[in-house]
Amino acid sequence: ELFREHSIPVGQVLTTKESFGTRRHYLNQKNCMTVMLENNVIPIVNENDTISVSELMFTDNDELSGLIASMMDAQALIILSNIDGIYNGSPADPGSSVIREIDHGKDLSNYIQATKSSFGRGGMLTKTNIARKVADEGITVIIANGKRDNILVDLLQHPKETLCTRFIPSNEPVSSVKKWIAHSEGFAKGEIHINECATEVLNSEKAVSILPIGITHVEGEFEKDDIVRIMDFQGNQVGVGKVNC
């Protein structure tokens, strides 16, 4: 109804978490929504609950929105909650205040509770994790109060005056493939365990591929282009990757 009042055409896009699990399906979705936007049609994306497998459903709409923002190389992602943002204490404490900006790497463990928001399925912990991941990919993320009147208009027209928490985006470019991999851990088909030398190289600043000589053993069944978890010599997960052979 809102879009109709402004004569803006919209189109519903139904997706599932599995549709993000392969590169081909991922790109098909991106191309579909790109064409819609090029023709001035606003995509409204929802999970297709009728065919989604319970074990593979999105955690909440925050997770879905993060995937879409990353996939479409959005300029910004706005996540709405029932509070004004991330507080430096309990939101119920009159002495607490909203953290207006969060830089890359800032430790938020003292401020976030794993409780669910009454505004949706996801809690602030989920929102924060999604926000940090998307901001690391170069996209500005804003957490604001969805129960405030005209909150979206205020964020767009008066961004500095509107109370919210803004995650500062990374300045380092991230390729489309790496964005897809970053959000694909839930689709991992197996694990690749690597030795100490390969772990050190992988943890260096230089981007590298893992060669067979650095692999000690594998778990699960996977093939080319599948997503796998990367485990170090002590059994700790150190990354996620795409199989190239």
List PLM regions with ranges.
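C-terminal catalytic "cap/lid" subdomain
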Residues: 1-245
